[in-house]
From Swiss-Prot:
A GO molecular-function descriptor: magnesium ion binding
Purpose of the protein: Catalyzes the condensation of ATP and 5-phosphoribose 1-diphosphate to form N'-(5'-phosphoribosyl)-ATP (PR-ATP). Has a crucial role in the pathway because the rate of histidine biosynthesis seems to be controlled primarily by regulation of HisG enzymatic activity.
EC numbers, comma separated: 2.4.2.17
Species classification: Bacteria, Pseudomonadati, Pseudomonadota, Gammaproteobacteria, Alteromonadales
Species, as recorded: Shewanella sp. (strain ANA-3)
Keyword Ligase: no
Gene: hisG
Cofactor dependence: Mg(2+)
UniProt cross-references to SUPFAM superfamilies, sorted A to Z: GlnB-like, Periplasmic binding protein-like II
Protein name, entry field: ATP phosphoribosyltransferase
Biological processes, Gene Ontology terms: L-histidine biosynthetic process
Keywords: Amino-acid biosynthesis, ATP-binding, Cytoplasm, Glycosyltransferase, Histidine biosynthesis, Magnesium, Metal-binding, Nucleotide-binding, Transferase
């Protein structure tokens, strides 16, 4: 491929999605090395360039066709979409799929001494946030007027510093809120990481590569969510044992050498196999039960 036909993927330079994004791409067979001093990393085995940028720059880069793909939190994507709708600015992208990492929620929080009944308790108060558009949409839907305080970071310290009465910020565990004397009152948006693609014209070779990558992403995530189960089972309780396997698709049943009363079962389960289920399998005569992770899946 020529330089202009190399696929450009934007990922977060640092932060909560950076490591998981890199690991996902490596699991898809894309070989690259990150130099912390450089914003671009070239794949060794595919015509792909990784652009390491601020997370809030990624949606715009994709929507404007500067890059072809982006891995981004849905919260940042939604914030940019609302901004562009407000400015009547085009947002040319498609969400290819949600990913299995980056879970968080955008929530309202207030100081521990604040008496909160519902969102109307914030009427007329000042709220600090890095997501003014998502906050405004929520408050407008509730019919609540407020004053905003736009901060790019350290939002949780705003009430203690006297900058705001409450905050609207990302929450994962709530530990940061607690450490700053705040408590969560209302979830206004739930988010996961996702893959987005620019809808500006792609060359056939680029689109083919995008399709390959998406197929691999799907396979990696399916593998993470699945387990490979092997066990020996008595033929007389075979149907009961198969019925117990969670989410199994048409397990493979094989005869055992020199044992006509037992068979081997191989199955891929898309649900967790809990200890209780394994004990039930054992009670039905199953033995040699193995539950193993799957690295890759396709088809």
């Amino acid at each position: 491929m020529t330089e202009s036909n190399r696929l450009r993927i934007a990922i977060q330079k640092s932060g909560r999605l950076s490591t998981d994004s890199q690991q996902l791409l490596k699991s898809c067979g894309i070989k690259f090395s990150i130099n912390e001093q450089r914003l671009i990393a070239h794949a060794d085995n595919m015509p792909i360039d990784l652009l390491r940028v601020r997370d809030d720059d990624i949606p715009g880069l994709v929507m404007d066709g500067v890059v072809d793909l982006g891995i981004i939190g849905e919260n940042v994507l939604e914030e940019e979409q609302i901004e562009r709708q407000t400015l009547n600015k085009p947002a040319e992208f498609v969400k290819l799929r949600q990913l299995d990492f980056g879970a968080c929620r955008l929530s309202l929080a207030v100081p521990s001494e604040f008496s909160y009944a519902d969102a109307s308790s914030l009427e007329g108060l000042r709220i600090a946030t890095s997501y003014p558009n998502l906050l405004r949409r929520f408050m407008q839907q509730k019919g609540i007027s407020y004053r905003d305080c736009m901060l790019k970071g350290s939002v949780e310290v705003a009430p203690r510093a006297g900058l705001a009465d409450g905050i609207c910020d990302l929450v994962s565990t709530g530990a940061t809120l607690e450490a700053n004397g705040l408590y969560e009152t209302e979830v206004i948006y739930r988010s996961m990481a996702c893959v987005i693609q620019s809808t500006q014209t792609q060359t056939p070779s680029k689109q083919a590569l995008i399709d390959r990558i998406l197929s691999r992403v799907n396979g990696v995530i399916r593998a993470r969510e699945s387990k490979y189960i092997l066990l020996h089972a008595p033929t007389e309780t075979l149907d009961q044992i198969v019925a117990l396997l969670p989410g199994a698709e048409n397990p493979t049943v094989l005869p055992l050498n020199d044992d006509t009363n037992r068979v081997a079962i191989h199955a891929v389960s898309t649900e967790d196999l809990f200890w209780d289920t394994m004990e039930e399998l054992t009670a039905l005569g199953a033995s040699s039960i193995l539950v193993m992770p799957i690295e890759k899946m396709m088809g």
